[in-house]
Amino acid sequence: KVKPLPGSGFLKTNIDFCIDWARQHKVRAAVYGVCFIAALEYFSLPNNSLRELQRKNPRITAMMEQREQEADDAGARFAVQQTWVPISRISPHLVHAVIVAEDGTFYEHSGVDWYEVEESIEKNFEKGKAARGGSTISQQLAKNLFLSTSKDPMRKLKELIIALRMEKLLSKKRILEIYLNVVEWGNGVFGAQAAARYYYGVPAASLSASQAARLAVMLPNPRYYDKHRQSSYLIRRTGLILRRM
């Protein structure tokens, strides 16, 4: 008869406890699992590139490259419309509208809104697919600069890690400035200055509150709203953001 290894009963008891706990707390278990994998991934992501952003403006982003490749694969023409401007030359209305629409706790979190992460995981479990993102402005910037629009869980994990690093290296003002200059606002349209010119024929500094609210509402799906500018949802959501500003 084979004798059990010393301590094997204790180990089995603890493993069983962990399994039972995970079954009863699926969302929390998923969050802790993500955090554990994040710790393993932490040292493999762009740190030097983030440091450079303290003083250098990015010339091209992963999102721009992705859109260019998609157009090339489809045999379509594609040109990036973007003009960099300092945040001092972007309408305060737009800055406020984007924060209200995309990340109401921007000045309170450290790159990741963990409550939103847990909520999105719970919603995605319920629907059985990646239906809700819960991304902060910092996470969105990480995706735009270094990653892609893929819904691969590992991509999302890297987004979280980069966002946390970014907040340690860059000020909130700098994060906003970069975000507002590189975020996608339509087919080939990137950044506030290009968006203001493209949709309203004015510089970013001259955007009104209503124009800013409309642009902010477009951010989750800019290429769709570029083609559906009179969408009833877009109009309703714009009114809501205006009232919150």
Regions found by a protein language model. Name each.
Residues 1-244:
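Juxtamembrane regions of bacterial inner-membrane/periplasmic proteins
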